[in-house]
Amino acid sequence: MTPSELMPREKLLTYGANALTDQELLAIFLRTGIKGLPVMQLANQVLTTFGSLRALLTADLNAFCQIKGLGQTQFIQLQASKEMTKRYLAQQMQMCETINTPHLAIMYFQTELEFEEREVFMVLFLDNQNRLIKKEKMFYGTINQATVHPREIIKEALKCNAAAIIVAHNHPSGNCTASQADRQLTQKIKAACHLVEVRFVDHIIVGKGSYFSFEEERFHQNN
């Protein structure tokens, strides 16, 4: 039997969750359809209505419950699933001996920041072996701007005896392209870190399903 002939649950058990389409994953989450609409058709209808899985995941309770077959119970389950994913990634970082590459941090930042409706600036504080000391959302802004104070970042880094930091913020517009203001801010934070001998690892911008890394840009420019 080919993968396309398997039902979603059997396909997951045979090939793993990453082999499933968004529709199939949602069908498993919904478990059952409604009268006159099998679960796979219901899942397709939900995705068509919202436009994407991301839009479904960011919908508020009122919008979520507008769809026949979706209710408060499913909304609560979905929010719990999202939170478990966040905590899993946070614990993965906490358990890592070192964060030698930013990819785990990028995954975590995407989970934490991608769905924020306003700009949020977040910092990971690392020890001298690149192990996570703490994480903190330090600054909150509007839909297109957050005021960031480098001195407050440095103050917190010294307070927790951090040897390095990774910073990130989101672009609620979904476009992760770095603006001139983003570049200027990065240089200010770098300079502040240099003064107190705290290593600046990277500044990551989170968009919708995408990200921009200043460190990756620097690497590609030099190679």
From Swiss-Prot:
Disulfide bonds: none
Biological-process GO terms, alphabetical: proteolysis
Single GO molecular function: metallopeptidase activity
Keyword Isomerase: no
Stored Pfam families: RadC, UPF0758_N
Binding-site residues for Zn(2+), renumbered to this chain: 169, 171, 182
CDD domains: MPN_DUF2466
Motif JAMM motif boundaries: 169-182
Protein origin, superkingdom: Bacteria
UniProt keyword annotations, A-Z: Hydrolase, Metal-binding, Metalloprotease, Protease, Zinc
PANTHER family: DNA REPAIR PROTEIN RADC (PTHR30471), UPF0758 PROTEIN YEES-RELATED (PTHR30471:SF3)
Annotated NCBIfam families: PRK00024.1 (NF000642), radc (TIGR00608)
Family membership: Belongs to the UPF0758 family.
Name the record gives this protein: UPF0758 protein HD_0732
Lineage: Bacteria, Pseudomonadati, Pseudomonadota, Gammaproteobacteria, Pasteurellales
